[in-house]
Amino acid sequence: IIGTPTYAVPTWMVEAYPDVLAETVRGRGIYGTRQNMDITHPVYRYHAEKVIRKLMEVSAHRKCVIGFQLDNETKYYGTAGRNVQLGFVKYLREKFHNDLDTMNHEFGLDYWSNRINAWEDFPDVRGTINGSLGAEFEKYQRSLVEEFLGWQAAIVSEYKREDQFITHNLDFEWRGYSYGVQPDVNHFKCAKHLTMAGTDIYHPTQDHLTGAEIAFGGDLIRCLKNDNYLVLETEA
């Protein structure tokens, strides 16, 4: 199984384009960790597409390659910079058919002078005290993951054979091991872009092993396609 190597950005990219790092509620990220980039950034997307296409050109025809894994445990990594804010406003305009009154009513924005009277005046949602608007923004952020995986799946599909699958290692909330539903990803929507569901399940070991995490993770991932699935990473 060949994985697309897009879950960590190289040093030269950050040096040349520092804004490829995600801007979150804590500000701009600092290079060092993996999975700290803005998955919507056009420069990141440009170079990611180049490396995906090159990888597919040299690997898709090989008989030993049975399938492809898109990225790695993809999430939105808290990205909430200017481009994401503008995308959210566009999303709301489409959702509410450009009707500000309906949107203000839906989210209760007349409270504490939160009312928005012009789309051009839409504030940075990172500072909102409105739980409904904040939840809608997180929903939008989760949709970025779905769009990102769909974008990669479309590229891979241009090269893969009919007998090769497309999967992704969907993960879970983390509390020292896999724990409950992943809050940053809608697994069911992302699975639409996969031909075979996949997951990472990390569990407690030895005296702490109960099987609960394994059973929960397996049940959830099986439901995505109502079929067998791949465990792409697990506790060693």
Annotate each PLM feature.
Residues 1-3, 166-167, 198, 231:
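Structural detector of well-ordered beta-strand residues that form the stable sheet scaffold
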Residues 2-7, 38:
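Structural motif corresponding to the early beta-alpha repeats
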Residues 5-9, 235-236:
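Short beta-alpha junction loops
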Residues 9-16:
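Glycine-rich, charge-decorated loop segments at or immediately adjacent to ligand/cofactor-binding or catalytic sites
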Residues 16-207, 211-214:
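Polysaccharide-binding and catalytic clefts of secreted carbohydrate-active enzymes
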Residues 72, 231-234:
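Short acidic/histidine-rich active-site segments
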Residues 217:
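Non-catalytic, largely sequence-independent nucleic-acid-binding elements associated
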Residues 223-224:
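Alpha-helix-loop-beta-strand connector modules within alpha/beta enzyme cores
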